[in-house]
Amino acid sequence: MIALSALLTKYTIGIMSNLSNGNSNNNNQQQQQQQQGQNPQQPAQNEGGAGAEFVAPPPGLGAAVGVAAMQQRNRLLQQQQQQHHHHQNPAAEGSGLERGSCLLRYASQNSLDESSQKHVQRPNGKERGTVGQYSNEQHTARSFDAMNEMRKQKQLCDVILVADDVEIHAHRMVLASCSPYFYAMFTSFEESRQARITLQSVDARALELLIDYVYTATVEVNEDNVQVLLTAANLLQLTDVRDACCDFLQTQLDASNCLGIREFADIHACVELLNYAETYIEQHFNEVIQFDEFLNLSHEQVISLIGNDRISVPNEERVYECVIAWLRYDVPMREQFTSLLMEHVRLPFLSKEYITQRVDKEILLEGNIVCKNLIIEALTYHLLPTETKSARTVPRKPVGMPKILLVIGGQAPKAIRSVEWYDLREEKWYQAAEMPNRRCRSGLSVLGDKVYAVGGFNGSLRVRTVDVYDPATDQWANCSNMEARRSTLGVAVLNGCIYAVGGFDGTTGLSSAEMYDPKTDIWRFIASMSTRRSSVGVGVVHGLLYAVGGYDGFTRQCLSSVERYNPDTDTWVNVAEMSSRRSGAGVGVLNNILYAVGGHDGPMVRRSVEAYDCETNSWRSVADMSYCRRNAGVVAHDGLLYVVGGDDGTSNLASVEVYCPDSDSWRILPALMTIGRSYAGVCMIDKPMUMEEQGALARQAASLAIALLDDENSQAEGTMEGAIGGAIYGNLAPAGGAAAAAAPAAPAQAPQPNHPHYENIYAPIGQPSNNNNNSGSNSNQAAAIANANAPANAEEIQQQQQPAPTEPNANNNPQPPTAAAPAPSQQQQQQQAQPQQPQRILPMNNYRNDLYDRSAAGGVCSAYDVPRAVRSGLGYRRNFRIDMQNGNRCGSGLRCTPLYTNSRSNCQRQRSFDDTESTDGYNLPYAGAGTMRYENIYEQIRDEPLYRTSAANRVPLYTRLDVLGHGIGRIERHLSSSCGNIDHYNLGGHYAVLGHSHFGTVGHIRLNANGSGVAAPGVAGTGTCNVPNCQGYMTAAGSTVPVEYANVKVPVKNSASSFFSCLHGENSQSMTNIYKTSGTAAAMAAHNSPLTPNVSMERASRSASAGAAGSAAAAVEEHSAADSIPSSSNINANRTTGAIPKVKTANKPAKESGGSSTAASPILDKTTSTGSGKSVTLAKKTSTAAARSSSSGDTNGNGTLNRISKSSLQWLLVNKWLPLWIGQGPDCKVIDFNFMFSRDCVSCDTASVASQMSNPYGTPRLSGLPQDMVRFQSSCAGACAAAGAASTIRRDANASARPLHSTLSRLRNGEKRNPNRVAGNYQYEDPSYENVHVQWQNGFEFGRSRDYDPNSTYHQQRPLLQRARSESPTFSNQQRRLQRQGAQAQQQSQQPKPPGSPDPYKNYKLNADNNTFKPKPIAADELEGAVGGAVAEIALPEVDIEVVDPVSLSDNETETTSSQNNLPSTTNSNNLNEHND
């Protein structure tokens, strides 16, 4: 190598020298030729030949040296050419070389074209010679992927690693580059010369995972492999994997395994994990000693543990008892260590009684002289504590438990039940168990390990109840009530008792105060203050109680005075006044200094802060807060003062400010509360175990890069592309356009546009679809509609209101980014992006509900509906609230027998709320099995005879409902509901979801025809039908029409033709008024048939039950509908809509209506009379408006928005259904609108009727079966099981041997003969299946599993999900509350509230006293795109309403007049009048 390099260098130098000489000679020759006048075109004769001669390579170098020399020569010649190409052409003028050589030289450089000879601008704009750097970020990943594939194929592998007889092929270079262990092995040790290397003490499974990580940078860490994986990673020096295992172990740390994890970390030198485990043991010592790991420790480890000064124990008795328990675990072997252990127990801190009665009489200590001396020392310490000194008399200094900031209830803008807590270490907010009742303006205090929420306002009444929260169990209870009703009161803890001071009782401000003794559970009055004080702040300094500021309802003035209470004398005295009047000020005590924060003086909201020194009896000003705040919560911790929420006079705040007295400065916490709230209770408590686990689960979910967002008013997105989801967890593409970039790719699925798969039931309605790039479908158009018509947040709608005045310079500060008011920068960005209509831009997140999961992995687990067991703590527990009569579908398929011979599932279908096969509605003739019978909660759809059995041949008029939505929860969280049948079409980019109250009622909406087919001319099914539902009847072979339907031309209801519900009374009339017609005259005529529920005799008779006026209204509508049937030529222009509310529009010329109609029909004015005699105009719409709607939409009438508008749905929800729900009893609290849509249905199939009938479940799309869900009431398990067994015996032989289960509230315990069926067929209803809220407190939280996953393979398991804020309280809590309150709970039902978070249907105000609502006007341009330009202006109906300010309303600051007098409500400008309930 050295000789070759030297020869090559010498040869290259010779070439360079020759070229240099040749160049010099060439220049001289050219000059001579020019001087002699020779023709430059003639070649030179032997000039410069010596310099131009090619130097031959030395012998022996071969072709390689020759090639290298030629390349070097060509580079030098190119440099010469570049020096002269600007002023001469060597090819033309000659350069001592032949023209052929010159050309060959250029050819070798690929530069024969003219562009290479000139300095021209390159197409990409870069100059020649520009120095740039190219970087390909995917190069490394692609290279490693290629090497990994070669490794799997055993290509170019040069080493074989062996562990436990398992061989793994790999590349030395790759392993050495990632692991210092392999680098040293392959470079310096004997293994560098071995092709097969055996690794000792390395688990084969762990080695495979680590080798995969080296090539892919991905490794899966779970409970099964973390131990062997960490050991192997530590040995192979893969520190990243070792750290990942340590992080995982931190998330799994609890009292049962912390000792083992600490020892494991110590063995493998995982310092961070070791410190974390030791800190955890110190903080949770009292829980750790209760598990077996402690009993299995060695005596040295026990001594190290109990000798630690930092362990946190309630008393020294616990230390003594754990030592005795350890000795008793193995007395023969451990008795010898008794004296050593007892020397580290600090017996002097035990009580004298405990020493004499327990310690001195312990058998294990008898006869032990050392222990007797220790007992004597302890008794001596009690007699002479100052003279007894030893290591055992030094008190312990336990490490501080991690603290959390607990925020309870509040006003947002009405009283809420939400509870959330802030982890000071993680700087994140989490949700806790909600309060059993709505509560705001209450007092909050911490007494012992319990949190007390005292008094307050529940949205309608001032209360005197007290709710008690146990952080250890995350549950609420109650204690004895106060003597007086109080809201906006002050609460503090003094001498182990709770003091409630002042407040407002609904009539006047209070000066009284009372005290609660937890030992006796009794409230009693104490001395009253000298002044009435509501919105008062209290604090305790040096054992004295201070009442600061407030509002005096008698003088109607905000107060600056302060009173002090002495519990020893039971007296109040006045102290120094503040410099400013403050009502609603937050009060906190920090370092024995009393701070009064914010507040207001009439309309002026303050941000100033004052500090009171009780030693000098004086107030002083400190630094102002960043924002003006009143009614904020204040708490002190670790030398800092925390101010939480409040309002600034305009909106509620979600930010938290922290004051540091050392620097006299404020800062804002980086994380905001989930919602802005004022009048909230705030306290600081130790972080309990359950919340520690919740935080660990959240951290684990974050480590999986899954962003979670709980939208309080989340709904299923209505866009088609958002509805089509993936088949397995790998594609968590949620509806509503939630981004699935963070989730693994799913197997390719063919789009099923006619069979939407709703992967997500919690997607926010305001979030547009993310799949805007799909081609070949209407996805782009649908997505554009969804984005254009996405409703703006309530806080994004710029409302014209006068902001409250604030202190000087307060308005100059930017407002905090709260949940109720976005930051100005955000508003400006939104206005720039969409100047005409604000858009709601949300991050793309993955949503998922474990309780109703549609992510099927195939196989026997393909349609797993509900978790049968949940993982909680150390193992799996059976979910007693969800207990099916049959086996688990995700278990072994052998134990499940197919219900149908052609079913694609091995397990039978579980009973479901979403089961769309009705017993009363469907008796499908099934080959080989006779009449099939199905379960369905809609077993009696009383308003729709078409869904019932038609005749003896049992051919159903409707095969199935298209899509069903169902859920349970609270109406105040969602204004659109469940059990609504919604076809696969959207309404302004979003579904219009309506429902009912589950009191024996069923409702659904059917919108948007699928085509423009005409009605069938006959009854035999010979005509065409454009509705999927009519296939089962129209073309059924050999089907006949029942006699009762003989006069009906089309015995099938067009899916765009009806909007009905079987809600009774007044609500049924509102259903009638939203009756919609299709786009054909024949179809409209069909709707006048008795089968049409909106004008049927059945509906008319039931409507009459609401009163004579209701019947008259129904009759008027039927008559109006009959009279308004236009001709087929102008049917699209004059179809009846009955829109609610009335629509005003100016008449347009005929040419502007698209030529659809030139004749203006009379205006249709419908009026419904209520029982009170009030007449409310429900709908009014001109024919011109209808023509405009028709011309702008689909001429065939298949545009949903041409028939029903969002304003109509909104009006119905707010003014009809919501009061109905509010008027019901407390059972309404289990109405949740978590929308659950059926994946598949027979009527959606495009297959033939024969194929539909052959498979009762329809054509399976994704997993073999539609998804189901069931909720089971276990309290009736025994009786229901007996009923089911009995019903099985009495079944017909041809029928399926399964009892029927109805979950409607109207349950019947006995059997009922069905007269429409064959003799012997009975209907049985199992009351065990009800509308109950399923809940497992620790593992199955609020309708969804906290950590449940059916997949046994870890990489297929879905990420953990936190509880959604939109869900209801636990069923168990509700049951306990009902049992505790008894009949009183039925009488004192709580008023639901409007959603706290933005919702498109939320633009209204509620008067909870008389259940009236007043929608706010909606600008016409907001609905322009939604209704196709048909709406120009909306005048919402006038209703009685009490003026309510959602922000500034205070117990003692508003006075209103009764709405019964029909007088306008008034509000004092200064907000200082007494408020009467």
Curated annotation (Swiss-Prot):
Record-annotated BTB domain positions: 157-223
Keywords, ordered alphabetically: Actin-binding, Cytoplasm, Cytoskeleton, Developmental protein, Differentiation, Kelch repeat, Oogenesis, Phosphoprotein, Repeat, Selenocysteine
InterPro entries: BACK, BTB/POZ_dom, Kelch-typ_b-propeller, Kelch_1, SKP1/BTB/POZ_sf
Subcellular location: Cytoplasm, Cytoskeleton
Residues bearing the modification Phosphoserine: 108, 111
Main location as per UniProt: cytoplasm
Ranges of biased composition (kind: Polar residues): 1125-1137
Source organism, top-level taxon: Eukaryota
Positions of region (Disordered): 19-62, 76-96, 108-137, 744-841, 1119-1200, 1291-1326, 1359-1416, 1446-1477
Skewed-composition ranges (Low complexity): 20-46, 763-813, 820-839, 1166-1192, 1374-1391, 1456-1477
Molecular-function GO term, any one: actin binding
Presence of the UniProt keyword Repeat in the record: yes
An annotated GO cellular component: Cul3-RING ubiquitin ligase complex
A Gene Ontology BP annotation from the UniProt entry: female germline ring canal formation
Record SMART domains: BACK, BTB, Kelch
Tissue occurrence: Both proteins are expressed in ovaries, male testis, ovariectomized females, cuticle, salivary gland and imaginal disks. Kelch short protein is the predominant form and is also expressed in fat bodies. On entry into metamorphosis levels of full-length protein increase in testis and imaginal disks.
Kelch repeats: 404-449, 450-496, 498-543, 545-592, 594-639, 641-687
Functional note: Component of ring canals that regulates the flow of cytoplasm between cells. May be involved in the regulation of cytoplasm flow from nurse cells to the oocyte during oogenesis. Binds actin.
Annotated PANTHER family: KELCH PROTEIN, RING CANAL KELCH PROTEIN
Protein name: Ring canal kelch protein
Gene assigned in the entry: kel
